[in-house]
Regions:
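Residues in intrinsically disordered, low-complexity segments of regulatory proteins
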Residues: 62, 104-105, 138, 233
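LRR flanking "cap" motifs
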Residues: 65-129, 133
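A general structural signal for stabilizing positions within well-ordered secondary structure
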Residues: 109, 118, 132-137, 145, ...
């Protein structure tokens, strides 16, 4: 019986063992802290904080800098459906990579797809390629575009297939790239510069376009106004070096054209049934 009793620990011994275990845990915890766990935790916490704010680049006034061009910021007002851009110094809106992809600002805020008005502010010099391309129905409601005088260039397919687009001020623009406004809903165009270049298919299939007034043209590309079936009047104040092939092809309502061209290429006026007069006084080659 005495041997059996010796095999059990007394209450005092049990308490002593528990104290030893607690002391061991405290020592282990001290070792854990001394090995840098607190520092690691602080680093981890700071990384998590950075991660949590990484997607929220907007400032308190609602302007968000573009990732591809931080000098430009944008803001969208959902109440007025207005998408605005501003720049801290002269720079261009970055090109959209390819057809069907989204612009930098669209990726940051998909609400911009509801915009009815776009305002391009001072210091922005160019609208990039495919910026407002509507082939993916990215901007189905876009009706008005307001450009600052700093905007001189419109990139390739920048406003392609915007059938709702009715107005844009191009008075300060000197360069319109390929298919920039093809299949858009524009009704009138006015260029006030004397050195305007209009690219291939720039306004092709603009079925609502009625009048075009240009102070001076240095270049007008093939099919630039092809199939603008409601175009009735085209005026250019200076002599154009060359009217490219099919430039007014299918402009069936064109009846008033005030321009002179040194060279007129093939099919420039094919299927222009309403056209009855053209001044060939400075034309050297047809």
């Amino acid at each position: 019986a005495e041997a059996l009793n010796d095999s059990f620990c007394s209450a005092e011994e049990i308490d002593e063992d528990i104290d030893n275990v607690n002391t061991y845990d405290e020592d282990l915890n001290d070792d854990f802290i001394s090995n840098g766990s607190v520092e690691d935790t602080e680093v981890f916490s700071s990384q998590m904080e950075a991660y949590s704010t990484e997607e929220d680049d907007s400032t308190t006034d609602g302007w968000t800098p573009l990732k591809k061009e931080p000098k430009i910021s944008f803001k969208y007002d959902s109440e007025t459906q207005t998408l605005s851009f501003k720049a801290s110094e002269p720079c261009a809106l970055p090109d959209t990579v390819s057809n069907g992809t989204r612009s930098d600002w669209y990726k940051l805020n998909k609400e911009v797809g509801n915009a009815s008005t776009v305002i391009i502010g001072d210091n922005i010099t160019k609208i990039g390629n495919l910026n407002f391309d509507n082939r993916k129905s990215s901007y189905p409601n876009l009706k008005n575009v307001v450009l600052a005088p700093s905007v001189k260039m419109i990139g390739r397919s920048a406003f392609y297939e915007l059938s709702a687009l009715e107005t844009i001020n191009l008075e300060s623009v000197t360069s319109i790239d390929q298919a920039s406004f093809a299949e858009s809903g524009l009704k009138a165009l006015n260029f006030n510069q004397s050195d305007v270049s209009i690219g291939v298919n720039a306004f092709a299939d603009c079925e609502s376009l009625e009048t075009v007034n240009v102070k001076g043209l240095t270049y007008i590309g093939e099919s630039a106004f092809e199939s603008c079936s409601k175009l009735t009047s085209f005026t250019c104040d200076s002599t154009i070096p060359q009217l490219s092939s099919a430039v007014f092809k299918g402009c069936s309502s064109l009846n008033q054209i005030n321009l002179k061209a040194v060279k007129i290429e093939d099919y420039a006026f094919i299927n222009c049934a309403a056209l009855s007069h053209f001044d060939f006084s400075e034309t050297e080659n047809i």
